Amino acid sequence: RMPSGPGHYGASAETPGPRPPLCPASSCCLPTEAMGPRALLVLLMATAWHAQGVPVIQPSGPELVVEPGTTVTLRCVGNGSVEWDGPISPHWNLDLDPPSSILTTNNATFQNTGTYHCTEPGNPRGGNATIHLYVKDPARPWKVLAQEVTVLEGQDALLPCLLTDPALEAGVSLVRVRGRPVLRQTNYSFSPWHGFTIHKAKFIENHVYQCSARVDGRTVTSMGIWLKVQKDISGPATLTLEPAELVRIQGEAAQIVCSASNIDVNFDVSLRHGDTKLTISQQSDFHDNRYQKVLTLNLDHVSFQDAGNYSCTATNAWGNHSASMVFRVVESAYSNLTSEQSLLQEVTVGEKVDLQVKVEAYPGLESFNWTYLGPFSDYQDKLDFVTIKDTYRYTSTLSLPRLKRSESGRYSFLARNAGGQNALTFELTLRYPPEVRVTMTLINGSDTLLCEASGYPQPSVTWVQCRSHTDRCDESAGLVLEDSHSEVLSQVPFYEVIVHSLLAIGTLEHNRTYECRAFNSVGNSSQTFWPISIGAHTPLPDELLFTPVLLTCMSIMALLLLLLLLLLYKYKQKPKYQVRWKIIESYEGNSYTFIDPTQLPYNEKWEFPRNNLQFGKTLGTGAFGKVVEATAFGLGKEDAVLKVAVKMLKSTAHADEKEALMSELKIMSHLGQHENIVNLLGACTHGGPVLVITEYCCYGDLLNFLRRQAEAMLGPSLSVGQDPEAGAGYKNIHLEKKYVRRDSGFSSQGVDTYVEMRPVSTSSSNDSFSEEDLGKEDGRPLELRDLLHFSSQVAQGMAFLASKNCIHRDVAARNVLLTSGRVAKIGDFGLARDIMNDSNYIVKGNARLPVKWMAPESIFDCVYTVQSDVWSYGILLWEIFSLGLNPYPGILVNSKFYKLVKDGYQMAQPAFAPKNIYSIMQACWALEPTRRPTFQQICSLLQKQAQEDRRVPNYTNLPSSSSSRLLRPWQRTPPVAR
C-alpha cells in the first residue's frame, strides 16, 4: 500500500499513458446529501457496469481535479466487499456499506493528492479500479511521498514527487539541491501521477534532488529527495596484500599491509603466517562509499623465523577472497646475474641480436651498465639497452642491430649494489662469407698460385681450371684440381680465419683460366687468374688494352652522360607544384617537425561522382594546373545544385605533382571547415585525374577586387594599374603590370589637392546574394568597414589555421578570395598561378619565393612558423589599406632590399589605414618573432577598431576632379622608414 507520508521509497513503477480529458470537479465532487437525479443516474450506470464483475469508482474517469477545502467523496462499488489502497489515513473518513466502500474528506488538501485503487479480494475474476486525485494548491505544487530513495546501480530510481495541479506539467524539471542542474549524462522522465524516474541510475548520481515547477511565473521546488545509488554487492570483498613480494636482511624492519573493502560493512579480514592466524589491531574507515578494513603487521627487527608465506583473507556472505605473498629473510646483500641465452653467441653479419640479462638483487641496484670489452678498439659506439625493474628483479636487454664485423667481441653487463659488483659477459662472434685473393709466386723454381681465403666459419678452398680466358669457370667444363694444399694461417677469436691454398702448376700455359673458390656456411666467393703470355708471372690484368674504337665509344658515352646531367639539372631547377601549407607535428624552439601530408588519411566520404560535375569557364590557369567553375548536382543533398570551383592538374603533370594535389586534398580534409577558409566540398580521386571541389567565390581574389574598386573610386589615373582581363574570376596571374605609384600609394600629375570624402548611409546587408545582385554589390563603393571586415575575417581564418597547427607560408591578398556578402576566405592557389612569369615570386636558390611577403627568418634562415605567417599578414594588411598596391613600392628585390629587411625597415602608413591599423602592421613586422602578436590578439584589436568605426561616420572616396588627390578621414602622416 502507498505510504501516507515521507519515508523510505523503492524503485520505480510504470508510468501511465496519455491521460483522457479530466473529470471536472464541479460535476464529480458533490456532497452526499446533495445528490439529485443526476447522481442517481450515475449510480444506475455504475450498477449496470458492476453486473459485469469489475469494481467501479464513482465519480468515473481516471483523474479528478479539485480545489483545496472541497468536500470529496469517492465511492467504490463491487459484487462483494471491496478494499481501498492509496494515501488514505489520516486524511480520509472510511464508510463501509457492502457491496460499496466510501471515502470522504470534508477539507481536501494537497496531502490528498495521489492514486487510489479499489479491489475486490473475494472476486475470482480479480480486477481493480483506479482514480488519481489532484488537489491543486498553488502554494504547494508538489507532494513528496519519500525523502530518501535507495536503488542498486543500473536500476530505475523513482523520485516520488506528485504534481498537485496537472496544468503545471509543461513547466516541470528536475534539479539538484540549491537549483544546480542534473548531470549531463542523467537520463530521466516525468509522470504527474508518480514523479521523476531516473533511468539506469549510476553511482555518480548520488545526490539530493528537488522537483521544480513554474507557478505564476516563479519557480517553486519541492523538499529534497536523497537518491542513494549503491553498488551491486555481487561477490566477496576486494582485497590487497602489500607488498606482493618482500626481502629483508636479518635485523631490518618490515611492514605487511592487508586491506579489504566493500560496500557492505558486514565482512571480516584476517592475516596468517603459514597456518598461524596473527592477532593484529584492525583499522576501519569509510572512503568513496566503501567500508575499508586494514591490518598492518610491523616487524622492527626481522629474523629468519619471520620468513615464509603470508596470506590475507576477506570473508563475507558471498564467500572468501584471498591473496598471498612470500617474505624472504637473507643474511646479507646480494645480486645474482643470469641469462637464459648462451653466453657464446654466433650471428651473421648484418643481422640483429639481443643480449638479455636477468638480475635479482637486494638492496636495489645502485648502478648498472653494458660495456664493450674489445678486441676492436675502434668500436666506441654508445650501447643501446633497456632495463625494466620489477620489485627486486631487473631485466636488461642490449640491442645490436645490423651488426658489422667490428662489433664482434665481448659484451659485459655490470651491476652494483650494497653487496658489491657483479658482471656477466657474452662473447659475440660474427659469421661472414669468405673473401678470396689470388696471387702468383715462385716456389722452388716452380710457378705456384697462392689463394688466400678469409672468413668465419673457416672457409674450404677448391681450385678449378678451364680453357680460354673467362671471368668464371663453368662447372661442367671446368676441371677440379685436387693437387692443392691448404693450411690455416691464422685463427684468432673474434677475427676471421685465414686459409692459404697453394696450386703448383709448373709452367703457366697461355689461354688457360685458374679459379680459386672458397665457401663456408654463410656464403661463397671466388677469383680467377689467367696468364697473358707464356712465362709471364703477373696476376690477372685489371683491364684490357685501350683501342681507338674503345676510346671513341667512351668519349661518346662521357658526352652523353654530361648531357644527361645537364638535362637533369635543368629539370631540377624547374619549379614544381608544392603544397605551401604545412601542419606541425611537434616543435622545440624554432625547430619544427611537420606531418608528412601523404601519410594523412583520406576519408572516402568526400568522394563525389565525376559525372555529376558540369564544367564551365576557366577561373585561373598556371604552370601546373587550373581552377574551373563547375556546377555540382547532388552535392550535400540529393536534389541540390551548387556552383563550385574545381582544382585539377594539367594532363602532363608528373607523379610528384599528382601526389602534391592529393596531399593538398588530405590537408584540407584534415583541417575541417571554417567560414573564412575556402572549404573543401568534395573530391574525385577514382577513375580519372584527381579533382578537388571547393567553394566558389564569386568576386575572385581580394587583390584584384581592391584594384577594381580603387579604379572605380579614384579613376584610372589615380588607381593601381590593373590587368585588363581581371574580372570576378580567380585572376592570380599577370600581376606584373607596371603602375604609377608613390610610397603613399597613388600618384597623379603632381597636384596637391585632395578628393573630399563624404559620409554614406549605412544599411544592413544580406549575407546571401543572387546572381543578378552580384554586379550591384560589386559596384558598391568601398567603406572603411569593408577593409576592416576583410582584415578581421582573414585574421580569424589564420587563427583557425594556427589552432590546427597549420602554417600557410604564402599569406597575401592574391591568396584570399571574396564570396557573396564580401566574405573573405583564405586559400592557396599556387596551382593556378604561373610563378615563372609572376614578378611577385623571386628566384632564391632553386626555388621561387614571394620574398616581399616573407619574414626575415624565412628569407635568411628558411624558418617558417606561425610567427612568420603573422609577418606576412602584416604585409597583407598593407595591401588591403593601400587598395592593392605592391608592397615596398619603388624598391627592387636585390641586396639593398635584403639589407633593408634585415635592418628592420618598415613601410610607411598606407593612405587608407587608420593609426591603430598601422600600429598592428608595425607589431606584425617586429624583427623578433616572439614579439609579434598572435592571430587571436590581432582579431581582438581589429574588433575593437571596428567598434570605434561604428561610432564615427563612414566615408567613401570620390573623385572630385582630374587634379585631385586622396584624402583620408584621419590625419595624414609622411612616410617613415624604420
UniProtKB/Swiss-Prot annotation:
Residues bearing glycans: N79, N107, N128, N187, N309, N320, N336, N369, N444, N511, N524
Topology Cytoplasmic: residue spans: 569-978
SMART domains listed in its UniProt record: IG, IGc2, TyrKc
Phosphotyrosine: modified positions: Y841
Keyword Oxidoreductase: no
Misc note: This protein is synthesized as a Gag-Fms polyprotein.
Function: Truncated version of the receptor for colony-stimulating factor 1 (CSF-1).
UniProt protein name: Tyrosine-protein kinase transforming protein fms
Organism: Feline sarcoma virus (strain McDonough)
